[in-house]
Amino acid sequence: MNQKSNESGAITGGWGCAAPVPPAQAMTVSALRAALAAAPVLPLTVLWPDGDAIEAHFHVTEVGRVQKDFVDCGGTLRRTVTCLLQTWVGDDVDHRITAGKLLKAFEHAGPVLGGEDLPVELEYEACNVVQFFVTAVVTKSDRLVVQLGGKHTDCLAKELCVPSSRLAGEGTGCC
């Protein structure tokens, strides 16, 4: 991952500070599986939101269904469910994962995913564990390119916290 420093010395680039992607714009399991099935022999390249690629020798160590049940700051019970691809970068620098191999992992995960057409996220560990939405897959002549989009946090009960005219201001007291 290429990390750069901005004028204040903060580290940017790679996975940091990506523009957020609404969950509705994340690829679904069926769309990702279709893209993988269309080019099973091609190796995968995964691009950070800023266009840099993760290490080519990454592994997908888990394909899972993650359900998060929570109460937002306004007291509303909420649930999100996603398909999570956990990645790991090992020492085997000659390793390459193909679209067909990832498709096989999805087949093994079928009972866990339960037939739900969930939004797909990818999890990666750098200095911290970070998650991104998978937003697109593009077929090139020599590889399948998986594009990642950023996730973000937000107040889910803004209308209960403060008047909308004050949401952007300091000291609004939201949450």
What residue ranges belong to the model's regions?
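Glycine/small-residue-rich phosphate/adenosyl-binding loop
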Residues: L85
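Cysteine-cluster motifs in flexible loop/terminal segments that predominantly coordinate metals
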Residues: Q3, E7-V21, H152-C175
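Helix-rich interaction surfaces within compact, conserved domain-sized segments
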Residues: K104-E159
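Short connector loops at helix/strand junctions that flank enzyme active sites
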Residues: E55-H57, R78-T82, G115-D117
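Short, solvent-exposed beta-alpha or beta-beta edge segments that form flexible loop/patches at the rim
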Residues: E55-L77
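Extracellular/virion structural assembly segments
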Residues: R96-A105
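A generic structural motif
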Residues: V89-D94
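N-terminal, charge-rich interaction modules
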Residues: Q3-E55
